[in-house]
Regions:
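P-loop/Walker A phosphate-binding loop and immediately adjacent motor/lid segment at beta-alpha junctions
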Residues: 3-9, 54-80, 88-90, 146-160, ...
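Pre-active-site segment of Zn-dependent metallo-hydrolases
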Residues: 10-47, 51-66, 77-94, 112-123
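Binuclear metal-ion centers of metallo-dependent hydrolases, dominated by the metallo-beta-lactamase
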Residues: 4-6, 90-91, 156-212
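Short secondary-structure boundary segments
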Residues: 46, 134, 160-162
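Active-site-proximal loop/helix segments of hydrolase catalytic cores
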Residues: 86-152
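Conserved acidic residues
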Residues: 39-40, 128, 155
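Beta-strand-turn-beta hairpins that frame and shape the catalytic cleft
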Residues: 1, 15-20, 69-77, 100-106, ...
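Short gly/pro/ser/thr-enriched loop/turn and capping motifs at secondary-structure boundaries
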Residues: 50, 138-139, 163-167
């Protein structure tokens, strides 16, 4: 599969058959999505402007709620969670999305803010590739993200929702989170290609940057 990081919490993941899933399209974060974006499936973790700009993406199917879905041969599960450490009292609910492509399970945390807990970890279950926020303030921070990584034990971890070098959004960069791990693979703004064989080689932390 091919993983492209488009900034903030937005990725486009394309399987070997050409089916694409795009997560949390954004607006109003100080930089813009690439123009003329297309995807077969779009997931939206919650209704805030920096995660639900579906009008900027040409998509066949938008999924924005808890539940089980199947479209274009991809099974998607929306898992209930919360946007803040007070379990929704501050910023409401959030949907963690998990799906399978090319025999691998991918989990996107959206704007998860609730602390690591056994109930949510159990609902998420086995995960090969974890896309996780690390910037704090509106989501879990670096330490909170590390706790989830330790609890879920994914094979590949890609941080998101951090302040980029040219960003103005009031969250932190990814360096504290990356500092918890050895051998971080920094790929710049290049897409990442992952096969099932790669996930058997031990945990890998991949730091992706938005293409300017």
């Amino acid at each position: 599969m091919k993983i492209e990081y488009l900034g903030h919490s937005c990725f486009r993941i394309t399987d070997e058959n050409g089916v694409s899933l795009l997560t949390d399209p954004y607006s109003g974060v100080g930089y813009e999505l690439p123009p003329r974006l297309c995807a077969d499936i779009v997931t939206v973790s919650h209704g805030h402007f920096d995660h639900n700009a579906t009008h900027l993406v040409k998509a066949e199917k938008v999924i924005n709620a808890v539940g089980m879905y199947e479209t274009n041969g991809v099974k998607v599960v929306g898992i209930p969670s919360y946007h803040d450490e007070k379990y929704g009292a501050l910023r409401g609910e959030n949907v963690v999305f998990k799906w399978e492509m090319d025999g691998l399970t991918i989990c996107h945390f959206g704007d998860l803010g609730e602390p690591c807990n056994a109930s949510l970890v159990e609902k998420i279950g086995k995960t090969d590739i974890l896309l996780i926020p690390v910037g704090g303030r509106y989501t879990i921070d670096a330490k909170g993200a590390k706790q989830f990584v330790d609890a879920i034990a994914p094979n590949i971890v890609i941080p998101m929702h951090y302040k980029p070098a040219d960003g103005t959004i009031d969250i932190t960069d990814a360096e504290e989170f990356l500092g918890f791990f050895d051998g971080v693979l920094r790929v710049g703004d290049a897409p990442v290609h992952i096969t099932a064989d790669e996930v058997t080689k031990g945990r890998k932390i991949i730091f992706m940057e938005r293409k300017h």
